[in-house]
Amino acid sequence: FEDWVDRIPEDIQIIAGPGNHDITRLSEPQPRLQDDIFPRIKDYDNFHRVQNPQTVRLHGIESKGLKHLMYHGYSFDDHVDRIQELRENAYDEPERVMIDLLKRRHLAPTYGSNQLSPEGTDHMVIEEEPDVMVSGHFHSHAVSSYKGVNVICSSSFQAQTDFQKRVGHEPDPGKVTILNFENRKTEVKQF
């Protein structure tokens, strides 16, 4: 990962948040990844580690920047399992789960297999409407919008896993969404 980051120009900001396969606890919210995981790049000015979920403001458009709600999406599996309409096609259309969670204003609205950290505040509540919601747990690419919110599900760079084969899910690897912050239009690049 560090070798990959080294190839990215310094004027491009990198925001890294943990997911369910990373070296951190599974219960959410997940703390940001520790310094010792990235010994060479941890002090780079363009490398930022955040918790999961996290809302960040990026690039001061109209002096305030766009609010990006970043959430890996570990609760998606449990949520899909409990709602028939989502169960039928959510793995092929991951934006449907994300939009459903935006409607509910909660990232883990169903109690079940998703592990939540017992904290005084529910960090999974979507308190402020984001401008952009970004996720990636399903390893499938999707771009949509819901009531003015750009909904982006990142694919991964990993081929189909054994688990995905068992459940009949074909990931969509190597797709990256580029969002124009001024007009909110998206472009997809295949790598």
Segments (PLM) and residue ranges:
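Extended recognition/assembly regions associated with phosphoester-bond processing machinery
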Residues: 1-191
